Amino acid sequence: MVRHLVVGDLRVQRIERKGGWRSWTIVWPEGALHAEADRFLRVHDGSGTQKTYAYYLVDHLRWLERECLAFGAVQLRDLERYMGIVGADVHMPLGEPWRVGKRPYGRDASATAASCLKGFYLHQASLGVNVGLGEKLDGTRLPSRVDRRRSLLGT
């Protein structure tokens, strides 16, 4: 695994717990806890899912910042576009490239990202944030089928 220091951006932070347990959260560049992400990740405390979700969620949160989108303003179409940008097969304009230099998500990664994002926004809706999106997500699947054309090209 390649490790590099992340400076000036949201990042995943490991937290050492008593008894050798580890938890994972997301922090702002100055080191402050990202409260919304932490509340969601705590639901998965002690599971292997927490670390995986933290890395998928931090990528999405960085994308939200670049797109100047707040949680309360995110629409289903924004999530579909994000999934398309990271490799899912969607039929819409995707906008500027994201994750430049990285391969698109494969089938399993795309499904995990969709599950993470759906869980995150349903959790936000349960707290009263962007309830409309939560209602739409409750009966919808985010696109996770891999765009084979992009997978072959590696873009």
Please identify what each model-predicted range represents.
Residues M1-D45, K51-V58, R62:
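Basic/aromatic DNA-contact patch characteristic of tyrosine site-specific recombinases
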Residues E36-T49, V58-L153:
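N-terminal core-binding DNA-recognition domain of tyrosine recombinases/integrases
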